[in-house]
Amino acid sequence: MKYVVSGYIGFDNFGDEAIAKILSQKLKSEGAEKITIISSNPEKTSDNLGVCSCGMLKFLPSIIESDVLISGGGSLLQDATSFKSLVYYLAVIYSALIFGKKVEIFAQGIGPIKSKLGQFLTKFALKRALKITVRDEKSQELLKSWKIDSELVKDPVLELELPQKNSRGTVGIQLRNYKGVDDSFLQKLADEVCKRFADKKIIILPLQKSIDTEVSEKFAQILREKGINNISILEKTSLTDVIDAISDLEYLIAMRFHANIVGIKAGVKTLAINYDPKVEKLASEYNLPLINLDDKDFSEEFERLCLPLN
C-alpha cells in the first residue's frame, strides 16, 4: 500500500514531529510500499524520517498515486487557529476522496469548529472516512453528535519506549508563549525555582523555536537576575535531541502536552503547567503536580514535585 500522511509537519513542533515519526515507523513495520509525508520542509522531513515528502501545496500528485491518505495526528480539524487552516486540511482530505482514495483519521483532536460552513464540510468529509481514531472524549462526543463512529485512543507519543537516565542535579523548564505567561507568572515561577533548585543545573527547553524562544530567553534572564547562573538553553531541538535532553533530567517543569508525556515516559519527576485542558487531564491521569497560570501560590505543587518517589 502507498500512503500519504497529512499533518502539521515540518514546522519544528516537537509533538507533531514525534507523531509523524511514530506513524511512519508503524506503517513501515506493516509493510508499506511507499510513505509520502506532506511537509512545510520536505527535504528535512525526508532526511529525518526516511520517507518521501512533498510540499504543503504540492500534494496532489502524491495523493493521485497513493492508496490511502492518513490525516493526523494533532488538532488539524478545528478553526480556533484559523478558518484557513481548517480549509487546508479538509482540502487534502477532499482531494483524496475525489480521486477515490481511502481516508483514515489518525489520533486527532477534532474541534472546536465554530463556523457553520466548517462544521458542514468537516462532517461531510468524516462521514466518508474509512477509519477514525480520536485522542479525547470531547472529540468522540462531537463525532457521536454527528452520528459518526470513532475509536478513542491514547496519544501516540505515549507509545514511545524511552531511556530512564534521570541524572541527578538537572532541572528542565519548558515554556511557551501564551497569554497568561506574563511577568507576574514568570517571577513567581522563578522564585520557586530559585528556592528549590538553586544548587542544580537548569536547562530551558524551547520545543518550537518560533513560539518558545522569546519566553525561554526572558525566563533565563529573570533567573540570572535572581542569582542563578548555571543555566543553558537547549539549542538543538530535533526529536532525538529533545528526547535525550528530557530523559536525562531529574526534574521537569513543562507547559507543552508532549513535553509532559516525554517526562512521564522517561520517569522524570514532572510538574505540569496548565494552559490547555489536555494538559490538565494528563496531569490528573498520571497524578502530576499541576500549577495554573493564574494561581497565586505555587509552593504546594512544588512541594509535591520534590517529594521522594515511592
Where are these regions (language model features)?
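Active-site anion-handling motifs in enzyme catalytic cores
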Residues: M1-N310
